[in-house]
Every structure is written in C-alpha cells, then in structure tokens.
C-alpha cells in the first residue's frame, strides 16, 4: 500500500494581469457554492460586474505581491510540498506528496490522477484553507 498526501488549496490566478484575474474569476465565480443564488444572477454578477470591473482593479494589487517565481500561494504551496516530501523521504516513510488547487493549476483532479498513476492506494486530503465554507469544502 502506497500512501499519499494531497495538499489542497483554493487556487490562484496564473498571472497578475486583468486577463489572468478574469480567467481565474470566471472559473471561481462559476461555482454555485461560491455564490449560492440564482444561476442567472450569478452569471450577471460575474460577467457584468466582476470580470469587467473588479479583475482589472485587483490585478494591480496582485502585481504588488507577485513573486519572481509566480503567485505567492503557488510558490509557498510548492515549497511546502517539496519540504514535506523531503521530510518523508528522509524518515524513510513512503508517502507521496502533491498539491492540488480547486480553481487553478495544478488542479486537484490532476494531482489525484498523478498520485494514482504513481501507485497511491490511499490518499489523505489536507485542506490548506483555514475556514469552513461550502466553496472550499463542498465544491
């Protein structure tokens, strides 16, 4: 039996630009658990307010915190994955560690497929978001 640990997080834009934010927000705000109301209202809010107005404005904030290697969330998630894998390997514990995001690459389902392809028969999911909400636990 090969065990695996999947570090799960919400996700992040691929780049600190209006386009990067729009792509991320389009997927994120399409989830009915994020906006738990009428699908038509969700579509209107996403496509007529959030994508055209909020994404360009927030892109500036993302650009200020963006790191040389990418989004802080992705950079630190990658570092945590590598550190945990190194620790398990050093202890001689056969545990595969991967990171998966709900709304951006690397996606949770891709990480799970990779773990299964590597022979994982037991996968422990570890949510890295600190709060309970249907957008993080039910999606």
Question: PLM features: residue spans?
Answer:
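Active-site-proximal alpha-helix that buttresses catalytic centers in soluble enzyme cores
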Residues: 1-139
